[in-house]
Amino acid sequence: GGIICGYNSEEVVLNHVDVAYAGATPTESSASFQNKLFKTTIDGGVPAFHFCNVNGKFVMANSFFHDNYNDQTYFTGGNGVIINNIFADSGNAADGGEAINVKAGCKLDVANNIIYNACTNAFKLSNAGNSEVIPLSEMTVYNNTIINCGWRRSKNKKGGSVWVEKAAKPVFVNNLIYDSRFGLKQPKKDGADMEHSRLTPNYYFASTETGVAQMAKDAELGIWFDTDIKSSVAGQLN
């Protein structure tokens, strides 16, 4: 399993912790399953850290999350700061796995993290789950380094570095996306709230022609900004 917080969890601080090899499928005897937290059926893994209290607070700082079988983090509520962490080797080829997966109900400040080899995305930013009691998320994501993400997912429809959907409106600026499978992407329908988002400037580097092509202006589902800095040929701007 992982660190699965309850609906009444008020405050969590993860500082200088090492969380690894979490995310296995829960059993009927698992505390999270018995309390209907995150999973109500025995049908897949759980994140290494899950927080869900819209009115709660959490801090993740100076920590190392690695080799976790599913998402490293999954947030369906909470006011949080995620700073100075390393997220490495999340997910598995069949099911995928994000480093930071955000749904509705969150207010987050995310900065100065290194994300390496996420199976699918470093960031999946969404407003799924929004309701009368669960507000739209507010996310400020800056000064993060995203390396080599997306390549391990065997069925990759949802990006390879950053995926924005369901009217999410993040501030996502001054991040480095290095040798990841795709650039910033959104679905054809129900994508980002482009009017209220700020998604540029960011820096995108690719050392291969495949990487260049998959983050180019005409890349499928890609979000392009002329104000970004991007490799137009392999190895440019290293």
Task: Walk through the language-model features, giving the residues of each.
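Extracellular beta-rich repeat passengers
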Residues: 1-238
